């Protein structure tokens, strides 16, 4: 145990350890009862919870909160009281964000320009660590684990949470090497395995048929829509659990946009997707849930159908109807 722990923290730590121990016993008993049923989904959730509570119970540092013990495992992310400032606290960009983002759903982030959508989505895989003058408070949990804790290294987080940017970002390499480079940088060296993953990733991004005969030609020779699908292929090559998409079709023509939207419908079968979009029509076409941001705050979150047909917040309605923007 670490030194210089105040008595109140130590007392809380011991109390929580007792609670975790009892919770493990309770969950193990529930697991035994479930083993005689066909409820496999619930059994998976119980196993996940047991695993997390055991990690919590073994934690020997009362001053570090690595996991969220009441995490809802229907969510891929849970955000608690998250704030972010730019320019050494000169600009308060995100204000008291509390939000749960569901697994295996497409969640659209909508709102006026400058409302915090892109700032928020880049927070989910710690892109702001690369920006000077940024400060943060609050917590972001990914599958119960605090993304800023020592137990979730930055490189591991970014392999699990892929990112696709507004404009296609191919490397100045061949189509093949655009994907292989990411694999090699994460320690995958076997050429047969790399070849397999490159093919699977391009197929997953609906690009294989377009490029299978030109794999070793420059990626810059592809059309804008093909380059964006290559960016998606590169993101899914590492088998992430989440895809973050920051206005992925804003630089594309309608035909290429339609192909990306069709691809999103396919990808959500395997990944949780968070997409920033300025297109209300696109949000309705591709998303299951919608979050409305306004002036750095989340004003409303619900199913996409509810947000677009019966919004609870007057500003949400004004934005959807085009009265604010």
UniProtKB/Swiss-Prot annotation:
Please give the function described in this protein's UniProt entry: Part of the ABC transporter complex PstSACB involved in phosphate import. Responsible for energy coupling to the transport system.
Q: Which family does it belong to?
A: Belongs to the ABC transporter superfamily. Phosphate importer (TC 3.A.1.7) family.
According to its UniProt entry, the protein's GO biological process terms are: phosphate ion transmembrane transport
Q: Where in the cell is it found?
A: Cell membrane
Reactions accelerated catalytically? phosphate(out) + ATP + H2O = ADP + 2 phosphate(in) + H(+)
UniProt binding sites for ATP = 111-118
Recorded hits in SUPFAM superfamilies, A to Z, give: P-loop containing nucleoside triphosphate hydrolases
Gene3D superfamilies assigned: P-loop containing nucleotide triphosphate hydrolases
NCBIfam families of this UniProt entry? 3a0107s01c2
Recorded hits in PANTHER family, A to Z, give:
ABC TRANSPORTER I FAMILY MEMBER 17
- E.C. designation(s): 7.3.2.1
Q: Report membrane topology.
A: Peripheral membrane protein
Q: Where is the ABC transporter domain?
A: 79-320
Q: How does it assemble?
A: The complex is composed of two ATP-binding proteins (PstB), two transmembrane proteins (PstC and PstA) and a solute-binding protein (PstS).
- One Gene Ontology molecular-function label: ATP binding
A single Gene Ontology CC annotation of this entry is:
plasma membrane
EC top class, as a word: translocase
- Cite the entry's keywords alphabetically: ATP-binding, Cell membrane, Membrane, Nucleotide-binding, Phosphate transport, Translocase, Transport
Matches recorded under InterPro entries: AAA+_ATPase (IPR003593), ABC_transporter-like_ATP-bd (IPR003439), ABC_transporter-like_CS (IPR017871), P-loop_NTPase (IPR027417), PstB-like (IPR005670)
For this entry, the protein name equals Phosphate import ATP-binding protein PstB
Q: Quote any Pfam family the record assigns.
A: ABC_tran
């Amino acid at each position: 145990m670490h030194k210089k722990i105040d008595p109140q923290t130590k007392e809380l730590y011991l109390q929580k350890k007792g609670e975790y121990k009892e919770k493990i016993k309770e969950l193990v008993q529930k697991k035994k009862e479930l083993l005689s049923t066909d409820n496999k989904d619930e059994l998976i959730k119980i196993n996940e919870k047991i695993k997390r509570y055991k990690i919590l119970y073994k934690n020997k540092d009362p001053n570090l909160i690595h996991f969220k013990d009441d995490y809802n495992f229907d969510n891929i992310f849970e955000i608690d009281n998250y704030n972010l400032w730019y320019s050494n606290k000169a600009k308060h960009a995100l204000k008291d964000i509390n939000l749960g983002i569901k697994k295996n759903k497409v969640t659209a982030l909508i709102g006026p320009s400058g409302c915090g959508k892109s700032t928020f989505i880049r927070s989910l895989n710690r892109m702001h660590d690369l920006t000077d003058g940024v400060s943060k408070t609050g917590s972001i949990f990914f599958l119960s684990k605090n993304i800023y804790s020592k137990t979730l290294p930055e490189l591991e987080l970014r392999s699990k949470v892929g990112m696709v940017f507004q404009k296609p970002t191919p490397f100045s390499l061949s189509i093949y090497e655009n994907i292989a480079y990411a694999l090699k940088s994460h320690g995958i060296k076997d050429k047969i395995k790399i070849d397999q993953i490159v093919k699977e990733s391009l197929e997953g991004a609906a690009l294989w048929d377009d490029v299978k005969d030109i794999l070793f030609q420059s990626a810059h020779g592809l059309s804008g829509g093909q380059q964006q699908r290559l960016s998606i292929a590169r993101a899914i090559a590492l088998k992430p659990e989440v895809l973050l998409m920051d206005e992925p079709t804003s630089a594309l023509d309608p035909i290429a946009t339609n192909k990306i939207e069709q691809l999103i419908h396919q990808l959500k079968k395997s990944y949780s997707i968070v997409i920033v979009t300025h297109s209300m029509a696109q949000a309705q076409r591709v998303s299951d849930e919608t979050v409305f941001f306004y002036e750095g705050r989340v004003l409303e979150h619900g199913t996409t159908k509810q947000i677009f047909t019966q919004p609870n917040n007057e500003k949400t309605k004004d934005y959807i109807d085009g009265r604010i923007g």
